[in-house]
Structure formats: structure tokens, C-alpha cells
């Protein structure tokens, strides 16, 4: 099975290399970092760590993910599975094998790394993040009958299934769009507990009041948009 990784990155010069080097290289064909308008050494450090680096000038988490997907889709041999992980080193890259295993062994089409079901370092998620995740997953359960406990970015999905989702969101609604569409298309989804720690540096989303409010609004908007 061919497995590639997409890592969206915005000003993560201190963390991105750590993420790349900690991933299980023996399981992966290519690690793709999508630099999303960083003003620091994210590109330089990601390249030095051995990743392929793409540039996405349109600001937004979803834009970065879509750029990576387009790159993999255009390859002579696209991947069977794509793994997503953030560039901030808050997730444990070595746990990628846990997320990939259900797909590799044919039990699932998509796997979400659940911080809610795993071990969270104290202070790794803010109170608004915890409440927002609870609210979003509760709405997913009520509206879509979807049994998720988290919207965490650490996840894997069969590439053909990902393309069939026709992902559209360009900012903060990316993860919830993937999960609700996967439910609508009756993909076999599984969650695995993951370890979550304080990120390297300050979050560009939860680290500011504006970022938290914008992310929360977009997630709720996306949930109701497809209902």
C-alpha cells in the first residue's frame, strides 16, 4: 500500500522538522508539507528534514490541504492512503501507525485520532476548544447520526474515498466537513485514542480570541450547511 502524508504549515519553523523526523519513514512514500504563506523558515526546515514542500499563497487550512491533495492526485501513481497531521508537534507522529492500521487491515475507510479518547497533556487544549469540540460532535450526532468524539486533524483516509468527498472548505471547517461527508457517504469510520501535548509555539487559531471565534463560527456554519 502506498501511503503519503500531507502537513499544512503556517509559521511552524520550530516544529515542522520534528514532526517530519518523527513520522514512521518505513511506512511512507512521501511527506508533503504545504507552506501556507509562512514568513519564517518553515520551508527551509521542512526541506532539510526531507519533505517535499509546496507553496500555497491563499491563506487557509483547507486551501493548504487541497493543494496537497491536488499534488498527490496528479502523481503517476496516487497513494492508496493519505495521512494528515498538523505541523505544530502537538500530536505524536510515531502514533501514525495506530491511525493507519485499521485502514491497512481493511476495517475502515477513514480513521480519526481522538484526543478526547486519548491522553491530553494539561493545557494542551483550551477550555473553548474542549467545549467547541463537544458541541460540534454533539451536533454531528444529532443531525447526522455520526458517532465521533473529536474533530482532531490527525487522521487518515483512503485516497479514493477522500476524492469522492469533493472537499470544499478552505479554512477552519475542513475537518468537520470531512467527517460529516464521510457519514453521509456511509464510509466506515473508526476512532483511535491518541496522545496530545502542548504545541510548539503559539496557536494561530486558539491562541487568539479572534481566531477561536472565527474557527468556532466556521465549524458550526459547516455543520448546518450540509444538513
Could you say what each language-model-derived stretch is?
Residues 2-4, 177:
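Cell-envelope/extracellular polymer assembly enzymes that use nucleotide-activated donors
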Residues 29, 43-75:
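Conserved donor nucleotide-binding strand/loop of the catalytic core
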Residues 35-43, 89:
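A conserved acidic beta->alpha catalytic loop
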Amino acid at each position: 500500500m502506498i501511503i503519503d502524508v500531507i502537513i499544512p504549515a503556517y509559521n511552524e519553523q520550530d516544529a515542522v522538522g520534528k514532526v517530519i523526523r518523527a513520522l514512521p519513514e518505513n511506512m511512507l512514500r512521501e511527506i508533503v508539507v504545504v507552506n501556507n504563506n509562512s514568513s519564517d523558515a518553515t520551508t527551509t526546515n521542512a526541506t532539510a528534514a526531507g519533505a517535499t514542500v509546496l507553496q500555497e499563497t491563499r491563506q487557509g487550512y483547507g486551501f493548504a490541504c487541497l493543494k496537497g491533495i491536488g499534488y498527490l492526485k496528479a502523481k503517476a501513481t496516487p497513494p492508496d492512503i493519505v495521512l494528515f497531521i498538523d505541523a505544530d508537534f502537538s500530536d505524536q507522529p510515531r502514533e501514525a501507525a495506530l491511525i493507519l492500521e485499521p485502514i491497512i487491515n481493511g476495517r475502515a475507510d477513514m480513521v480519526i485520532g481522538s484526543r478526547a479518547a486519548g491522553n491530553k497533556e494539561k493545557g494542551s487544549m483550551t477550555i473553548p476548544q474542549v467545549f467547541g469540540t463537544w458541541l460540534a460532535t454533539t451536533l454531528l450526532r444529532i443531525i447526522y447520526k455520526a458517532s465521533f468524539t473529536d474533530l482532531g486533524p490527525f487522521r487518515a483516509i483512503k485516497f479514493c474515498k477522500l476524492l469522492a468527498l469533493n472537499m470544499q472548505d478552505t479554512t477552519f471547517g475542513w475537518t468537520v466537513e470531512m467527517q460529516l461527508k464521510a457519514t453521509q457517504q456511509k464510509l466506515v469510520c473508526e476512532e483511535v485514542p491518541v496522545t496530545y501535548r502542548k504545541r510548539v509555539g503559539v496557536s494561530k487559531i486558539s491562541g487568539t480570541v479572534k481566531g477561536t471565534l472565527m474557527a468556532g463560527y466556521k465549524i458550526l456554519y459547516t455543520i448546518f450547511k450540509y444538513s
